[in-house]
Amino acid sequence: SLRMGVKYTLPPLASAPQKKNYQPLFGKSLASYKVTSSDLKGACFYLVSGHGGPDPGAIGKMGSHELHEDEYAYDIMLRLARNLLTRGAKVHIIIQDAKDGIRDQQFLNNSKRETCMGSPIPFNQVRRLKQRSDKINTLFKQDKYAYKRAIFVHVDSRNKGHQTDVFFYHQNKNSESKHL
């Protein structure tokens, strides 16, 4: 109960409005961006970088450095997000790290700070995948775009004899999905 004469600070009714053409997840130097075309106006993308939080994904070695898949996938996903935004698309960044931003170092330090849009990422793989798909499905139902696609970025560790560049997964019985 409230007491007379005591000052209380109330939380805001909604989160602070985000600046136009500004995404702090890109890092201080790249947070502001310009929309340079309307090529993707009306398109909405749900971007997910592989693994994250308690799961670093594949771990490679280069000299004395460990290369953690989740860090490189996250960096690639942020670059893709920025590119899509500059071309007029709506972009939802599902896996987020408020500190990393887009990085230009050859070796990216591993962290476990990533969240699923603010929620901690579960260790259990099934729960982790369900969390991501639930978040995308919720946003998908709210978004009123004609063109909506989810893109999952992974950077798998392969030996030179078995390198595969890109995998596309789609719904078998959906001609639009096959066309993509």
For each predicted feature, which ranges?
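A broad, low-specificity signal marking well-ordered, structured residues that form hydrophobic/aromatic
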Residues: 8, 45, 166
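Short, functionally critical alpha-helical segments immediately adjacent to catalytic or ligand/cofactor-binding
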Residues: 1, 5, 47, 151-153
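Active-site-proximal helix/loop segments of hydrolytic enzymes
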Residues: 37, 67-180
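Boundary/activation segment at the start of structured domains
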Residues: 14-59, 65, 78-79
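Generic detector of bulky aromatic hydrophobic side chains
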Residues: 3-9, 53, 72, 125
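Extracellular LysM carbohydrate-binding repeats and other cell-envelope/extracellular binding modules
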Residues: 1-21
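Surface-exposed beta-strand edges and their flanking turn/coil or helix-capping segments
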Residues: 60-62, 106-107
